[in-house]
């Protein structure tokens, strides 16, 4: 039977490191993700219907068929704008040390 060193057994009793430093960063990241998720859903749908009714049919007097087509283009452009904004915010949200490389 092996005898275990008491110091080695006490080393296992050390609590795991606290991740509270990253907790705020995680909450901030989730808030950003939730914001852009809602924006990704609401903005294109809202722009589709509002541009169809008020801009293309109301202002320009287009037919129902043509207004569907152009409103869809507006919605697709809105999706791409939201995606570009998300990538920009996500890129700049990281710590400057991570982007520049670790400097000791």
From Swiss-Prot:
Example GO BP: vacuolar proton-transporting V-type ATPase complex assembly
Major subcellular site: endoplasmic reticulum
Sorted UniProt keywords: Cytoplasmic vesicle, Endoplasmic reticulum, Membrane, Transmembrane, Transmembrane helix
GO cellular component: endoplasmic reticulum membrane; endoplasmic reticulum-Golgi intermediate compartment membrane; ER to Golgi transport vesicle membrane
Role summary: Required for the assembly of the V0 complex of the vacuolar ATPase (V-ATPase) in the endoplasmic reticulum.
The UniProt record lists the keyword Lipid biosynthesis: no
Protein name: Vacuolar ATPase assembly integral membrane protein vma21
Family the UniProt entry places it in: Belongs to the VMA21 family.
Lumenal side stretches: 50-68
Compartments, record wording: Endoplasmic reticulum membrane; Endoplasmic reticulum-Golgi intermediate compartment membrane; Cytoplasmic vesicle, COPII-coated vesicle membrane
Keyword Endoplasmic reticulum (UniProt): yes
Cytoplasmic-facing ranges: 1-28, 90-104
Residue stretches spanning the membrane: 29-49, 69-89
Membrane association type: Multi-pass membrane protein
């Amino acid at each position: 039977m092996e005898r275990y060193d008491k110091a080695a057994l006490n080393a296992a009793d050390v609590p795991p490191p606290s991740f509270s430093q990253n907790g705020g960063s995680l909450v901030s990241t989730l808030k950003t993700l939730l914001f852009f998720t809602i924006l990704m859903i609401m903005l294109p749908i809202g722009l589709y219907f509002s541009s169809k009714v008020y801009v293309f049919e109301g202002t320009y007097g287009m037919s129902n068929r043509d207004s569907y087509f152009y409103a869809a283009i507006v919605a697709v452009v809105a999706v791409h704008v939201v995606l570009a904004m998300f990538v920009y915010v996500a890129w700049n949200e990281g710590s400057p040390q991570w982007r520049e490389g670790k400097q000791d």
